[in-house]
Amino acid sequence: MVFHLPDSMDYSQGSLVEPLAVAMRAVNLTHFQLSETVAVIGAGTIGLLTILAARMKGAAKIIVSDVNSHRLTMAKKLGADVIINASEADPLSIIRAETGGKGAAAVIEAVGITATANQSLFAVRNGGFVTWIGNSDPDVTINMQQIVTRELTLRGSYGFNQEFEYAIEAVKSGLIDPTILIEQTASLSDGPRIIDDLASGKSDLIKVILNP
């Protein structure tokens, strides 16, 4: 499928339409009401863009948890109301404190490992909605009793559908500006070094644009 980018959009904006569409898909599939609290577990590119999509849908309070302080700083810039460094504090305790002890109305898990998958089940309120968008480990072990006895709704989200068109329009209209995630612009020849630095953990840049 091919989508035409409007002439008013540059390639930097265009490069972030796909991950924004993925984030918008997850939010569209997640049930919460206006003025409710949404928790996002994982502040990678998709998790960060989920902040923008959740706010656009009407989330009143957005809580973001991650172990990377740089990503959490970016989450705050994007509008997260509460950020939690999970390597320094217990996310569940803070989420409960921020929601009057009930838990978030909805939780979007954007990591995809056993620890955070289970964390998402404990972070949501009774009868709440959990969406998994993280896709790191093929097999995870979860606490099934949390789903059954607390009547949780759990679903997965993958890719996008009509959200790609929605993402284009949101960026074109200025409703969402995802380009804040672009932290460096470099030449294509610098690509191998930058990729190696990211893979090794030497760099924690979120998005880099490589120009010919």
Predicted feature residues:
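Glycine-rich phosphate/adenylate-binding loop and adjacent beta-alpha elements
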Residues: 1-2
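Conserved acidic E/D residue at the C-terminus of a beta-strand in Rossmann-like folds
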Residues: 66, 134, 158
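C-terminal hydrophobic helical "lid"/dimerization subdomain
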Residues: 118-122, 161, 165-212
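Glycine-rich cofactor phosphate-binding loops and adjacent beta1-alpha1 units
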Residues: 30-32, 73, 78-153
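Mid-domain Rossmann-like dinucleotide-binding core that forms the NAD(H)/NADP(H) cofactor-binding site
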Residues: 9-88, 93
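Structural detector of well-ordered beta-strand residues that form the stable sheet scaffold
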Residues: 39, 63, 129-131, 155, ...
